[in-house]
Amino acid sequence: MEKKIVFITGASSGIGEGCARKFAMNGYRLILNGRNVEKLAAVKRELETEYHEDVCLLPFDVRDRRAAAAARESLPEAWNAIDILINNAGLVIGVDKEHEGSLDEWDVVIDTNVKSLLAMTRLVVPGMVERGRGHVINMGSIAGDYAYPGGSVYCATKAAVKALSDGLRI
């Protein structure tokens, strides 16, 4: 039986790295994405050494749709049938009140937390539909249900992640 392939965005640290470790521990092949090539390479070395699983790196900024599409297209044939997509890349910057916040910072948060999730889903899910199987895990946050002072934009993006996840199931 062929090992399943998991594609994880934001895999160079934190929750994404933790997911990579858990899936490697359980015998999955991994496609890891992140912006920091050195950190990704270190994660790859650790996982291959500790768990002896195949790891493919796709370093790019998920906000860059062209880079995402080019990375997806660059995958060797043996890595094309992605079974699980984990949209984990995300960030929070700025904790200003809405009437004081930076539109540029908000663009970065929205582009990373919402639009990149849509773009990655659009790049990967058609193959899942074609094969009749696959799973998408979108990392949300309790902040999507409960706003906190200065966090309204981040909280709104996490509420959007929840709504998009619900919509994807339909």
Question: Model-derived features: where do they sit?
Answer:
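The beta1-alpha1 cofactor-binding region of Rossmann-like NAD(H)/NADP(H)-dependent oxidoreductases
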Residues: 37-38, 59-70, 103
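Substrate-binding pocket helix/loop in short-chain dehydrogenase/reductase
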Residues: 96-98, 102-110
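Residue(s) in the substrate-gating loop at a strand-loop-helix junction
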Residues: 141
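Active-site loop immediately N-terminal to the catalytic Tyr-X3-Lys motif
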Residues: 99, 148-152
